Amino acid sequence: LFTRLALTRAALLAGFAVACTSSGHKAASDSTVSTATAVTSTGTPAEEPMMNDLGIDTSTAPPTLPTELAAVAEFGENLYDAAKAGKWDNGRAIMDSLDRAARSLPVGANAQSADGLELPRVLDSLRQAVSDRQRVAALQLSNRVTYLAAKMSPGYHPQVPSDIALLDYSGRELEIWSAQRNARMLKRTAADLSRTWDAVRPDVVRHGGTTAAETMDSLVTRVASAKTAAEYARVATPILDHVDVLEGLYTKP
């Protein structure tokens, strides 16, 4: 997943470069046009397009997922893996990168949404958990970061639907709560997983993922029928692995 996120971010940057080049060619071809204010057929001034620094008309172009928000999700997951493996020195370095990415989020990156406002508080608690080597707290909080990043993403029309990221989040929740033998949280996670999958399944099928969807159906059914922490734990890894397959449907050339 980290590699795919990095590729997605690289693709975004490549797209920005193409947009800049295209904008430059357009500017050159338009150089002979009069600079007088454009008017409509009725003689009233025409509305000028809202151009951003990349020369993209933001009044019509869909907003692009900020690379900083993609980085928050990536570093959150990286930190989860570091805490899971007990690699605390690495975890502290990832925490620094996560903080930098979060501080660099654009003002428009849903920063004032409920999820955006929660993020700084979660990061403060996460940094303390990493500093104190509190494994369970670090796992819970780093996974919460991935959840918040996913919830802040839909308005940007990410290449991979945010619900796919939420399936990944739920798989990690199954790991966390099965290890804690927390039946209440496991049932809650199972319900969340089912709702998320129901929401995104049609889009997966539209992207040629009929077989992948059927496999995910069976995994979600296994979670729904699980009775013990061990049963939840056994299906967590297959779900996380299969989310990689689902993501591949959206990132393949």
Regions inferred by a protein language model and the residue ranges of each:
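Bacterial N-terminal signal peptides that target proteins for export
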Residues: 1-10
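C-terminal motif of bacterial Sec signal peptides marking the signal peptidase cleavage site
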Residues: 16-19
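Mature extracytoplasmic or organellar-lumen-exposed domains after removal of signal/transit peptides
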Residues: 21-253
